[in-house]
C-alpha cells in the first residue's frame, strides 16, 4: 500500500482534498488504448501510489476490459503484450494478458482494488445480453463509443439483476437512479471527469464534475455533470478513492454505471441532450483543475523511490500507450528507426512505456480541462514548478484530470492513477524518458488527452519527466539520456539532449526531472514530471525551439523535452538538416528498430512492471540499455536517426500534423476534454498570441509557451508547435488542441490558418488501437476517420483552388499481396516506402522514406497550392537505392466533391491493392488565402516580415545595408539559394516541402533574415525554401503587382495585338515601370530569377505555364480585388505572369552556354573576360543559375564590398545570362543592358547592385570583373582604352583601357563603378575593349574567330592592318563562333567584331591581332567593337546565344556591352543576336523577331527596372510621347546620335576609335563594315573595326556589334528593320550587317527605308551606329527608321548614326542607341505609340544601350544614347549600359533609352532618383556623357535627323534634346 500511502501523502501535500480532486473517468477508449485519459487528469495523476497501480489497472481496463479478465496476472504479460500489441489501451493493453495478476497486485498495493473487485468488473463486462454484444462488436468495428440507458433486467445473470435493483432502490424523492451502459474500446477515454463530493453539500461520493464536449457520453445525454456514480459494473464506488474509480472505469470495455441524478435536472430518467446543453458541465471542469500538481509531484516522487510503482503506472499505461500511442501519437514510431529506438527507450522506462503505450491517452485528451480549467490552472501557474505542471495540465482536460487525481503517476488514487497515470503520470514517467527516447511514442504516450490538447506538451513533458523522474533513480541519467535522445533526437533537438543529458537522469534535463520528481510541489502528481519537465523545459528549453516540443511533450517533455529541446536547439543544425525526403539513415534505422524493439520489450516489462519493482527493473533495463548500447542513444546517433527519420522538424511537423489532424476530430474524440479542448484551445490561442510567455497558464498555455520558446528558436511558433506537436500528435487531445491553436493562430501563413478553420470541427473518436501497436507509432483511431474510396471517376465539376493543408499520418495494413497469407508472410520483412501526393496527375509533394512491414507512419504535412484541381492522388512507392522506385499502392480523392462538402476532413483512404492511408485535410479557399492580412508577430504584435508591408521591410533592411537593392532579404536569400543549388531540380516551385519545416524556416527568417542558414546541411529540401518564398509573396499585405497595376496588365494583355509582339511587350513593360520602387525592384529581381527557372524547363520540367500557375496567384491575387460573391480568377494572374516570362530575358540558357565556354575559361573569363559583358552574362549563365555558381547573385555579393567587383562580375555573368535570354527579345536585351548599367550606376551601392541588379548586375559585374582581369591579363584592356575615346586613346591601348576601364571598363565602366558608377571616362575606356575582351576570354573561341577573322578582316583591312587584323580576327571569331554555334553565328560574328574592336579583346581573341589593333587607336577602337562583338558572339554563343535571349541579348547585351565595354558588351550581344536576327530576317520572321524583341524589351525593362528602376524604362512609359514629340522624327535618333555624336565630336578620331571610333570607322569602316556586316554580323562589325581601324576600326567594329545587338535581338525580328537601320549602324549592325548600309539593310529586314538609308550610309549607316559618324549619321537616320522598327538596331543605328561617328564607338551602341530607343519605347511600352518609331524606340532602349555603349566608347556616342536614355532614366541608362562602359556617358544615357525618352528619362530619373541606388552613378555617367551626349546628340541630330524621324518618337528630337536635358538634369 505504499503507493496508497504515498497518494495520501501527496494529497495532503497538495492540499487537495478528495473533493477538490477531480478525476478523468474512464480512460479514453476511443483510442483503442486504455487511456485513463479521463481518469488521467492531472489531479488524478498526483496520487502517486495509486497511479502507478492505477495505471496498470486502468491499463488493464482500458487495454482491454476483456483482457483484464485474463487476470491481473496476465497483466504483467498483458502489459507487455499490449505494448506489443499496441492495440488495446496503452495500459490495459499492457495489462492485457497479465491483466489480472499485474493489475490486481498492483492495484491492491497502490489502490484498494482487490481481485474480487476485478472479478466483479469482469463478470459484468462479460455477462451481457445480445444488444450489448452487438454494441461491443460495433464499437470494435467502428471505434465509436456507445452510451445508453440500461434496464436492470438487461443486466444478465440473476445476481447482476438483483444487484442492479438494489442500486435502483437508492432513488429518493429528489434523485433518480438509473443504469448507464457504456461500451467502448479498451483504451478509450470516456470523456468524464469525476470528483469527490459535489462541491456543495457533499464531500464524499464520486460525482461527475464535467463531461468532454462532443464526446459520446456528452452527446448521448445519459450522463450529466453533477450525477453521482454509485457503482461501476455493480462495484460500489461511493467510498473508493477517485483514482481507484478511474482505474475501475478504465478497465472494462463494457461499463455499467449506476448513476444517481437530481430529478428535474434532466428530467427524471430521461437521458438526453438536455444534459448536453447543461451549463453545469463547465463549472466542474474548473473544479477539476483545482487539483494540485503537487500531488502528482509527490506521486512522482514516490514513484522515484519506488520505481516499480511508477513503472507499473507507466507500464500499464506506457506499455499500451507505447504500442499505440507511441507509435501513433508521437510519430516517433513514424520514424521507424527513431521510433524503434524511442520505443525501446520508452518501453525501457517501465512507467514511460506504459504511459506511452497508453492509447487511451488520446482519450485522455478529451479530458484536457476546458479553458475554464486552464484558466484556473493558470492561476496556479505562477508557481513555476508546480504551476508549470499545473499549467500544462490545466490547459487541458487532461490536465484537469491530472489534477483530479494524479492520473499520470496515479499518485492520488491508485486505480485512477493506473489509467490516469498511465496517461499522465505513466506517460509522464515513461513518457519522459521513453517519450523522449521515442518522442513519437511519447506522442502516444502523450496520448494523455490532456497532454494531447494543450497539456499534451505538458503531459508529454510530464510523462517524460515523470518517466525520467521515475527512472532517474532507476534509469538514472542514462535512461534520461536515452529518452531525451530518443525523443528529442527524433526531433533532432531532443537528440542532442539525449546525448548530452540523460533525460531523467540527473543531467540537466534529467536533473530537473528528478528534481521535479523530488518536489511534489508540482501541481500534478503525475504531471509532476511533466510539470517539472516542462518547467525545465521552459527554463531549460524555454529558449530552444524545442520549447515547443517540450510543450508538446508536456511537462515530461519539459524536463526531457525541455532538455531535449535544448538538445534540439543545440542540435538545431540537425534539426535544420531535416530533410523531408531524405530517407532515414539505414544504420540509424536498424538501430532505431533495435532500440525500439528493446524499448517495446521494456515497455512490455513496464506493463509488467506495474509493480514498483518492475518499474525499477525497467528503469534499470533502460539504463542498462542505454549504457550498454550508448550508441543507440548517442546524440550523434539520434541525430542521424533524426535525419533519417523525418527530421526533428519533420517529426515535429508530423506530430503537429497528427495532432492537428487528430485535434480536429479529437474534439469529439476526447469527449471529456472536448469542451476543455475548446477552452484550452482558446487559452492556447491566447497564449499563442502571447507566445512570448512560455509558461502558459494552462497546459495549453504551457504548450503554447513552449511553442513560443520555440519560436524564439529558429523555428517559428508554428514550427515549434509542430515540434511540440510531436508529442501532441501522440496525444490527440493535446494535438488537437495544438492543432486548433494552430488553426486559430495559424502561425503564420494563410496556409497555417487553414488548420485553424476546422480545428475543432471533426469530432473523431480517439485514435484507434486497431492497428497492431508494435507497428503503429501514431495512434490512429479509425473511428475518427471517414472511410473513403473513389469508386467512380470524378464527374466534371469545377476544380478547387486555394490551399490544401494535408497531413499524411500513416499507412496501415499495407500488405504486399492481396491475400492475407501473403501479407502475413511479408509481415516480418521491412520495406522502405514513401508517399507521393499528386494533384491532377501533377506531382506536388513527397514524404520521407519510412520503414516497416504493414504500418508506416509518415506523419508529414504539406500545404498544396490548388489551382482548379479536381483529384488528389496518394501514391506509395517503394524506395530502392539501386532500382527504379516501384509504385506499390495508390488511392485517389475527389477534391472537387469532398471539399465542397466541408473544408475539413479526416479520411481513411483505401488504397489499392490493399491498405489504408490516414489523411487529414484542411482547405482554405482563395478568398481567405489571398486576404493578405498579416499575422502579427508574437514579439512585436504586428507583422515584422511575413505579412509586413514590402516598403517597410525594405526600408528597415536597407538601414543595415545602405545602398542595397530594395529587395527583401528573405526573397534574395531564397532565390540565391535556389540558384546556388541549381535550377535543374525537377518541379522547382511546384513541389511543396514539409509544412513543419517550412514553418521552422519562417520562424528563423522572422527572427533574423540575414542569419538564416539555408545550406543543404540545414535545409536539405529546396522545396521548403521555395515554399517560404511563396508564402512570403502570398502574405504580402498588397500583392507585388499592386491591384490597380495588375488590372492594367490584365487589360493590356487583353488588347495585345497578335501581329505586334514588340508593341505588346513594350506596353506590358511600360506598365510594370509604374510600380512603386520596392515592388518594381523586387519584381524585376523575381522575374529575372523565374526566367532562369523557365530557361531550364527542359530539365526542371517547369515551363512558363507551369511556373506561372504556381507563382502568378501569390504575386498578383488579392481577395479585395475580387467581385463580391465571385470566385477569384486564377487564370488572369497566370496568363500575365506567363506572358511576362515569355518576353522576359532568360539568362540561364546563355549562362549555360557561357558556362560551357567559360567552364574552362572561368579563370579566363575572370582573367580575360574582355567580353565581360557578354561573357559575364554567359559566365553567370554558365553556372546554370544566373551565374549563381559564381555566386554573383548570392548575398555574398552584397555582403562583400571588397569582393564587390567579383560579385559584380558574377552578377554580370548572370546579367549576361539574362541578356542571352533576352537575346530572344530585343527589348529584353535592352532591358538587360539597361539593367546592367543601372546596376553599375549604383556601383556605389554594391549591395544594392548585387541584390537588385543581381541578375542583370551580376551579369554586368561579371563582365566587368571578367573584363578587368582580362584586360589586366592581356591586351584586351588595351582595346578597352580605345573605347574611352580621348582619354583612353592615348592609352589606346590595352593598358590604359585595361587600367582605367580595367575594372569596369570592359564590362561596365570602371570596376568600382561597377558598371554604373563608373565615371563616363571610365565607361568610355571600358566601353568596348573591356567588354569584348571579357567575352573573348570567356569564349576562348577567339582563336577560331581569329582564323575566320582574317577572312572577314579582309574587308575591314581597309582601315588599318592592325585594325583589319583585328577586324579579321573579329570576323574570324564571328565565323568561328558561328561554326561553334550555328545559331549565333551571326551574332557571334558581331560579337566578335565588337571584341575585335576592342583591341584587348581582340587580343584575347587572338592575342597578336588584338594587340595589333590596340596599337592603332582607331584600330583598337574597332577592335574593341570587334572584340566586343566577337566576344559577345562567342560569349553569347557560350551563353547559348541561339536562344532568343541572344537576340535580346544582342540588343540588350549590346547595350550592356556598350555600357560595360561598350562595344564589347553590346556588340557581343549584338553579334550573337545579330546572327539570330539575321536568320530571322532571312526567314523573314519579322514577327518572330518582334516578338523576341518584345520579350527582350520586357526583359530589358524588367532588368533595367530591376537594376535601377531604369530611367529609360519609366520615361518611355511615362512620356514616350514627350520624347517622341520632341524627337519626333529626329529627336529620337538624335538622342541616339547624341550618344554617337559626342563621340565623334569628342574624339572624332580617337573618340571614334574609342567612343568615336565609330566615327572614324564611319568612313572606312562603313565599307568595311558593309562587307563584314554582310559577311557576318560580327564580321561586319569587324569590318567596321577595320574601317574604324582606319579611323577607328573600333567604331566600325562596335557598330557591327551594335547592329548585331539590334539584329541579334532576334527579339526584334521585326526589328529586323532595326537591323537595317543597323545597317546604318553598319557598324553595330556592322556586325550584323556587315555591309554598312547594304548589309545593315540586309540584315535588318527591318526597314527598307532603313536599309536604304542605311544602305546609303550603309557603311556609315552601319558605321553610324558604329564609327561612321558622318556616314553613320545618314545611315543612322535611315536606319533609325528601320531601327526604330528594329528598335535595337534601328535605334542603335539611328542613334548610332548619331554616330556620330561616335557611332563608331557607339556604333554598337549607336545601334544600341537606336535600339535602345526603340527598346526603350518597347520597354516602356510607350514606344508603341510611335509606331515604327516606337519600334525603334523600343529597341531604342537597346539602342540606347548601344548608344551609351557608344557613349562609353565615345562620350558623345554614349551620350547620345545616354542622353536619350539618360534623360529618361538618367543614370539608369547609363549605368544600365554601363555595361557599355565603353560609352560611359552614353552608357548611362543610353540606358535611359533616352534618346527619345529623354524627357521622360529625366523625369524618371528625378522621380526615381531617391529610389534608385544607382542614380548617382547615373548622374555621374550622364554628366560625362551628358556633355558628350550633347555633342553627339547634335551630331546625331544632324545625321540622324531622318533617323530621328524614324526613331523620332523615340529619341525623337529628344534624343538631342533629351541629351541636353539629360545633361541639364544631371
Swiss-Prot record:
Sequence ranges of Polar residues compositional bias: 750-760, 1356-1377, 1393-1408, 1416-1429, 1538-1587
One biological process term in Gene Ontology: maintenance of presynaptic active zone structure
Residues covered by the Rho-GAP domain: 948-1148
Pfam families the record matches: C2_SYDE, PDZ, RhoGAP
GO CC annotation: cell projection; neuromuscular junction; presynaptic active zone; presynaptic active zone cytoplasmic component; synaptic membrane
Stretches of the chain forming a coiled coil according to its record: none
Subcellular compartments: Presynapse
UniProt cross-references to InterPro entries, sorted A to Z: C2_dom, C2_domain_sf, PDZ, PDZ_sf, Rho-GAP_regulator, Rho_GTPase_activation_prot, RhoGAP_dom
Modified residue annotations for Phosphoserine: 719
Biased composition (Gly residues): 1659-1670
Family annotation (PANTHER family): RHO GTPASE-ACTIVATING PROTEIN 100F
Task performed by this protein: GTPase activator for the Rho-type GTPases by converting them to an inactive GDP-bound state. Promotes the anchoring of Liprin-alpha clusters at synapses. Recruits and keeps Nrx-1 levels high in active zones in the presynapse opposite the postsynaptic region.
Name of the protein in its database record: Rho GTPase-activating protein 100F
Organism: Drosophila melanogaster
Amino acid at each position: 500500500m505504499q503507493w496508497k500511502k504515498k497518494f495520501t501523502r501527496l494529497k495532503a501535500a497538495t492540499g487537495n482534498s478528495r473533493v477538490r480532486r477531480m478525476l478523468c473517468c474512464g480512460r479514453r477508449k476511443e483510442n483503442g488504448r486504455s487511456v485513463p485519459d479521463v481518469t488521467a487528469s492531472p489531479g488524478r495523476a498526483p496520487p502517486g501510489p495509486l497511479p502507478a497501480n492505477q495505471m496498470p489497472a486502468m491499463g488493464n481496463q482500458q487495454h482491454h476490459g476483456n483482457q483484464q479478465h485474463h487476470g491481473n496476472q496476465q497483466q504483467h504479460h498483458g502489459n507487455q503484450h499490449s505494448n506489443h500489441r499496441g492495440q488495446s489501451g496503452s495500459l490495459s493493453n499492457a495489462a492485457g494478458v497479465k491483466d489480472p495478476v499485474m493489475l490486481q497486485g498492483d492495484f491492491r498495493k497502490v489502490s484498494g482494488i482487490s481481485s474480487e473487485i476485478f472479478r466483479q468488473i469482469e463478470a459484468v463486462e462479460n455477462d451481457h445480453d445480445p444488444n450489448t454484444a452487438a454494441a461491443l462488436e460495433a464499437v470494435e468495428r467502428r471505434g465509436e463509443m456507445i452510451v445508453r440507458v440500461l434496464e436492470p433486467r438487461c443486466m444478465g445473470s440473476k445476481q447482476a439483476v438483483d444487484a442492479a435493483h438494489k442500486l435502483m432502490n437508492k432513488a429518493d424523492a429528489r434523485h433518480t437512479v438509473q443504469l448507464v451502459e457504456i461500451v467502448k474500446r479498451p483504451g478509450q477515454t470516456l470523456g468524464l471527469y469525476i470528483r469527490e463530493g459535489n462541491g456543495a453539500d457533499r464531500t464524499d461520493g464520486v460525482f461527475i464534475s464535467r463531461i468532454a464536449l462532443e464526446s459520446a457520453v456528452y452527446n448521448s445525454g445519459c450522463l450529466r455533470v453533477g450525477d453521482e456514480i454509485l457503482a461501476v459494473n455493480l462495484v460500489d464506488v461511493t467510498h473508493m478513492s477517485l483514482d481507484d474509480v478511474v482505474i475501475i472505469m478504465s478497465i472494462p470495455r463494457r461499463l455499467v454505471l449506476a448513476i444517481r441524478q437530481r430529478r428535474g435536472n434532466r428530467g427524471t430518467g430521461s437521458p438526453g441532450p438536455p444534459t448536453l446543453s447543461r451549463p453545469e458541465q463547465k463549472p466542474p471542469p474548473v473544479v477539476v483543475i483545482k487539483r494540485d500538481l503537487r500531488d502528482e509531484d509527490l506521486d512522482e516522487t514516490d514513484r522515484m523511490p519506488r520505481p516499480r510503482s511508477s513503472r507499473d503506472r507507466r507500464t500499464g499505461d506506457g506499455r499500451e500507450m507505447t504500442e499505440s500511442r507511441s507509435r501513433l501519437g508521437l510519430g516517433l514510431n513514424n520514424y521507424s528507426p527513431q521510433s524503434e529506438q524511442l520505443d525501446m527507450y520508452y518501453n525501457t522506462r517501465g512507467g514511460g512505456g506504459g504511459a506511452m503505450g497508453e492509447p487511451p491517452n488520446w482519450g485522455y485528451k478529451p479530458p484536457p480541462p476546458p479553458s475554464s480549467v486552464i484558466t484556473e490552472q493558470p492561476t496556479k501557474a505562477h508557481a513555476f514548478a508546480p504551476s508549470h505542471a499545473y499549467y500544462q495540465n490545466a490547459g487541458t482536460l487532461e490536465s484537469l484530470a491530472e489534477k483530479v487525481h494524479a492520473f499520470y503517476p496515479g499518485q492520488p488514487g491508485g486505480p485512477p492513477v493506473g489509467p490516469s497515470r498511465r496517461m499522465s503520470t505513466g506517460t509522464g514517467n515513461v513518457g519522459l524518458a521513453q517519450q523522449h527516447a521515442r518522442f513519437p511514442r511519447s506522442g502516444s504516450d502523450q496520448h494523455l488527452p490532456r497532454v494531447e490538447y494543450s497539456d499534451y506538451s505538458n503531459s508529454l513533458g510530464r510523462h517524460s519527466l515523470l518517466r525520467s523522474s521515475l527512472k532517474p533513480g532507476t534509469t538514472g541519467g542514462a535512461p534520461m539520456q536515452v529518452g531525451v535522445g530518443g525523443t528529442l533526437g527524433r526531433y533532432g533537438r531532443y537528440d542532442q539532449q539525449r546525448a548530452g543529458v540523460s533525460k531523467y537522469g540527473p543531467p540537466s534535463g534529467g536533473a530537473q526531472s528528478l528534481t521535479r520528481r523530488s518536489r511534489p510541489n508540482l501541481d500534478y502528481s503525475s504531471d509532476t514530471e511533466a510539470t517539472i519537465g516542462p518547467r525545465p523545459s521552459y527554463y531549460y528549453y524555454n529558449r530552444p525551439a524545442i520549447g515547443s516540443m517540450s510543450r508538446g511533450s508536456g511537462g515530461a517533455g519539459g524536463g526531457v523535452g525541455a532538455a531535449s529541446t535544448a538538445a534540439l536547439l543545440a542540435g538545431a543544425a540537425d534539426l535544420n538538416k531535416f530533410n523531408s525526403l531524405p530517407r532515414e539513415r539505414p544504420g540509424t534505422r536498424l538501430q532505431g528498430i533495435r532500440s525500439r524493439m528493446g524499448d517495446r520489450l521494456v515497455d512490455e516489462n513496464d506493463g509488467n512492471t506495474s509493480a514498483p519493482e518492475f518499474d525499477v527493473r525497467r528503469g534499470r533495463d533502460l539504463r542498462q540499455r542505454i549504457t550498454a548500447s550508448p550508441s543507440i542513444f548517442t546524440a550523434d546517433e539520434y541525430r542521424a536517426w533524426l535525419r533519417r527519420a523525418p527530421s526533428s522538424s519533420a517529426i515535429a511537423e508530423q506530430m503537429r500534423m497528427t495532432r492537428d489532424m487528430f485535434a480536429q476530430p479529437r474534439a469529439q474524440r476526447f469527449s471529456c476534454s472536448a469542451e476543455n479542448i475548446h477552452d484550452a484551445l482558446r487559452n492556447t490561442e491566447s497564449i499563442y498570441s502571447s507566445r512570448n510567455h512560455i509558461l502558459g497558464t494552462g497546459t495549453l498555455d504551457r504548450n503554447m509557451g513552449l511553442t513560443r520558446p520555440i519560436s524564439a528558436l529558429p523555428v517559428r511558433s508554428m514550427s515549434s508547435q509542430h515540434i511540440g506537436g510531436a508529442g501532441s500528435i501522440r496525444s490527440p487531445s493535446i494535438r488537437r488542441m495544438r492543432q486548433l491553436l494552430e488553426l486559430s493562430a495559424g502561425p503564420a501563413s494563410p496556409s497555417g490558418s487553414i488548420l485553424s478553420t476546422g480545428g475543432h470541427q471533426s469530432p473523431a473518436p480517439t485514435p484507434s488501437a486497431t492497428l497492431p501497436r508494435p507497428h503503429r507509432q501514431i495512434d490512429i483511431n479509425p473511428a475518427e476517420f471517414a472511410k473513403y474510396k473513389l469508386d467512380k471517376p470524378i464527374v466534371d465539376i469545377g476544380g478547387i483552388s486555394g490551399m490544401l493543408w494535408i497531413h499524411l499520418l500513416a499507412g496501415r495494413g499495407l500488405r504486399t499481396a492481396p491475400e492475407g497469407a501473403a501479407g502475413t508472410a511479408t509481415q516480418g520483412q521491412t520495406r522502405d516506402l514513401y508517399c507521393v501526393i499528386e494533384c491532377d496527375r501533377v506531382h506536388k509533394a513527397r514524404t520521407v522514406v519510412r520503414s516497416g512491414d504493414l504500418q508506416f507512419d509518415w506523419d508529414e504535412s504539406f500545404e498544396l497550392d490548388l489551382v482548379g484541381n479536381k483529384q488528389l492522388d496518394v501514391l506509395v512507392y517503394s524506395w530502392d537505392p539501386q532500382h527504379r522506385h516501384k509504385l506499390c499502392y495508390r488511392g485517389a480523392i475527389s477534391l472537387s466533391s469532398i471539399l465542397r462538402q466541408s473544408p475539413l476532413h479526416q479520411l481513411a483512404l483505401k488504397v489499392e491493392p490493399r491498405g489504408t492511408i490516414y489523411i487529414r485535410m484542411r482547405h482554405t479557399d482563395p478568398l481567405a488565402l489571398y486576404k493578405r492580412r498579416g499575422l502579427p508577430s508574437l514579439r512585436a504584435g504586428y507583422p515584422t516580415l511575413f505579412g509586413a508591408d514590402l516598403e517597410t521591410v525594405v526600408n528597415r533592411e536597407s538601414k543595415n545595408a545602405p545602398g542595397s537593392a530594395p529587395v527583401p532579404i528573405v526573397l534574395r536569400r531564397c532565390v540565391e539559394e535556389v540558384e546556388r543549388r541549381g535550377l535543374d531540380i525537377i518541379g522547382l516551385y511546384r513541389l511543396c516541402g514539409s509544412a513543419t519545416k517550412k514553418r521552422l524556416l519562417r520562424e528563423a527568417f522572422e527572427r533574423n533574415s540575414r542569419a538564416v542558414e539555408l545550406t543543404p546541411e540545414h535545409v536539405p529540401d529546396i522545396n521548403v525554401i521555395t515554399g517560404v518564398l511563396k508564402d512570403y509573396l502570398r502574405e504580402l499585405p498588397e500583392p507585388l503587382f499592386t491591384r490597380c497595376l495588375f488590372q492594367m496588365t490584365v487589360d493590356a494583355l487583353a488588347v495585345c495585338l497578335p501581329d505586334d509582339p514588340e508593341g505588346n511587350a513594350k506596353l506590358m513593360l511600360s506598365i510594370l515601370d509604374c510600380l512603386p520602387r520596392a515592388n518594381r525592384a523586387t519584381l524585376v529581381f523575381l522575374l529575372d530569377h523565374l526566367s532562369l527557372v523557365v530557361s531550364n524547363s527542359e530539365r526542371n520540367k517547369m515551363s512558363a505555364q507551369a511556373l506561372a500557375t504556381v507563382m502568378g496567384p501569390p504575386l498578383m491575387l488579392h481577395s479585395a480585388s475580387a467581385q463580391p460573391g465571385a470566385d477569384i480568377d486564377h487564370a488572369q494572374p497566370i496568363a500575365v505572369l506567363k506572358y511576362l516570362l515569355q518576353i522576359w530575358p532568360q539568362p540561364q540558357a546563355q549562362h549555360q552556354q557561357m558556362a560551357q565556354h567559360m567552364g574552362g575559361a572561368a579563370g579566363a573569363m575572370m582573367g580575360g573576360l574582355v567580353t565581360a559583358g557578354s561573357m559575364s552574362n554567359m559566365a553567370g549563365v554558365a553556372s546554370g543559375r544566373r551565374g549563381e555558381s559564381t555566386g554573383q547573385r548570392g548575398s555574398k555579393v552584397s555582403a562583400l564590398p571588397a569582393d564587390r567587383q567579383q560579385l559584380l562580375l558574377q552578377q554580370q555573368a548572370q546579367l549576361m545570362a539574362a541578356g542571352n535570354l533576352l537575346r530572344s527579345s530585343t527589348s529584353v536585351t535592352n532591358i538587360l543592358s539597361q539593367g546592367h548599367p543601372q546596376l553599375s550606376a549604383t556601383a556605389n551601392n554594391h549591395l544594392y547592385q548585387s541584390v537588385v541588379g543581381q541578375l542583370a548586375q551580376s551579369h554586368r559585374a561579371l563582365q566587368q570583373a571578367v573584363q578587368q582581369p582580362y584586360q589586366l591579363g592581356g591586351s584586351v584592356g588595351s582595346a578597352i582604352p580605345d573605347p574611352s575615346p580621348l582619354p583612353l586613346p592615348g592609352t589606346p591601348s590595352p593598358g590604359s583601357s585595361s587600367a582605367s576601364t580595367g575594372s569596369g571598363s570592359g564590362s561596365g565602366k570602371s570596376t568600382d563603378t561597377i558598371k554604373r558608377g563608373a565615371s563616363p571616362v571610365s565607361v568610355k575606356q571600358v566601353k568596348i575593349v573591356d567588354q569584348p575582351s571579357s567575352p573573348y576570354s570567356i569564349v576562348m573561341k577567339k582563336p577560331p574567330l581569329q582564323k575566320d577573322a582574317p577572312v572577314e578582316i579582309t574587308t575591314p583591312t581597309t582601315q588599318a592592318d592592325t585594325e583589319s587584323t583585328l577586324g579579321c580576327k573579329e570576323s574570324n571569331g564571328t565565323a568561328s563562333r558561328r561554326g561553334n554555334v550555328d545559331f549565333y553565328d551571326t551574332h557571334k560574328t558581331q560579337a566578335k567584331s565588337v571584341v575585335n574592336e576592342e583591341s584587348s579583346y581582340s587580343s584575347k581573341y587572338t592575342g597578336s591581332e588584338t594587340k595589333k589593333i590596340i596599337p592603332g587607336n582607331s584600330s583598337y577602337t574597332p577592335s574593341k567593337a570587334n572584340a566586343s562583338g566577337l566576344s559577345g558572339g562567342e560569349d553569347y554563343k557560350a551563353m547559348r546565344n541561339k536562344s532568343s535571349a541572344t537576340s535580346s541579348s544582342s540588343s540588350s547585351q549590346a547595350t550592356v556591352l556598350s555600357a560595360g565595354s561598350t562595344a564589347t558588351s553590346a556588340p557581343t550581344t549584338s553579334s550573337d543576336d545579330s546572327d539570330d536576327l539575321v536568320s530571322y530576317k532571312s526567314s523573314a520572321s519579322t514577327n518572330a523577331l518582334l516578338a523576341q524583341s518584345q520579350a527582350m524589351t520586357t526583359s530589358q525593362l524588367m532588368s533595367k527596372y530591376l537594376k535601377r528602376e531604369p530611367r529609360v524604362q519609366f520615361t518611355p512609359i511615362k512620356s514616350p510621347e514627350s520624347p517622341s514629340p520632341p524627337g519626333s522624327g529626329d529627336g529620337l535618333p538624335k538622342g541616339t546620335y547624341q550618344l554617337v555624336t559626342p563621340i565623334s565630336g569628342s574624339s572624332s578620331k580617337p573618340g571614334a576609335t574609342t567612343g568615336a571610333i565609330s566615327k572614324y570607322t564611319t568612313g572606312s569602316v562603313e565599307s568595311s563594315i558593309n562587307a563584314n556586316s554582310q559577311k557576318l554580323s560580327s564580321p561586319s562589325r569587324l569590318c567596321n573595326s577595320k574601317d574604324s581601324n582606319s579611323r577607328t576600326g573600333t567604331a566600325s567594329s562596335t557598330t557591327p556589334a551594335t547592329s548585331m545587338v539590334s539584329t541579334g535581338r532576334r527579339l526584334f525580328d521585326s526589328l529586323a528593320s532595326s537591323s537595317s537601320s543597323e545597317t546604318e549602324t553598319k557598324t553595330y549592325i556592322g556586325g550584323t550587317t556587315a555591309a554598312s548600309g547594304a548589309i545593315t539593310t540586309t540584315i535588318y529586314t527591318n526597314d527598307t527605308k532603313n536599309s536604304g538609308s542605311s544602305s546609303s550610309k550603309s557603311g556609315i549607316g552601319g558605321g553610324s551606329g558604329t564609327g561612321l559618324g558622318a556616314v553613320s549619321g545618314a545611315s543612322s537616320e535611315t536606319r533609325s527608321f528601320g531601327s526604330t522598327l528594329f528598335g535595337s538596331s534601328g535605334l542603335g543605328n539611328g542613334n548610332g548614326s548619331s554616330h556620330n561617328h561616335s557611332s563608331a564607338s557607339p556604333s554598337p551602341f549607336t545601334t544600341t542607341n537606336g535600339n535602345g530607343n526603340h527598346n526603350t519605347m518597347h520597354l516602356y511600352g510607350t514606344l508603341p505609340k510611335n509606331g515604327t518609331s516606337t519600334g525603334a524606340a523600343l529597341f531604342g532602349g537597346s539602342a540606347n544601350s548601344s548608344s551609351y555603349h557608344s557613349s562609353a566608347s565615345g562620350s558623345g556616342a554614349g551620350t547620345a544614347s545616354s542622353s536619350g536614355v539618360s534623360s529618361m532614366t538618367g543614370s539608369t541608362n547609363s549605368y544600365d549600359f554601363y555595361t557599355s562602359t565603353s560609352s560611359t556617358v552614353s552608357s548611362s544615357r543610353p540606358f535611359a533609352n533616352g534618346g527619345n525618352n529623354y524627357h521622360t528619362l529625366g523625369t524618371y530619373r528625378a522621380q526615381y532618383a531617391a529610389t534608385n541606388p544607382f542614380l548617382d552613378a547615373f548622374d555621374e555617367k550622364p554628366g560625362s556623357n551628358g556633355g558628350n551626349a550633347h555633342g553627339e546628340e547634335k551630331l546625331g541630330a544632324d545625321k540622324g535627323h531622318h533617323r530621328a524621324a524614324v526613331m523620332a518618337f523615340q529619341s525623337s528630337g529628344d534624343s538631342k534634346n533629351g541629351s541636353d536635358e539629360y545633361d541639364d538634369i544631371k
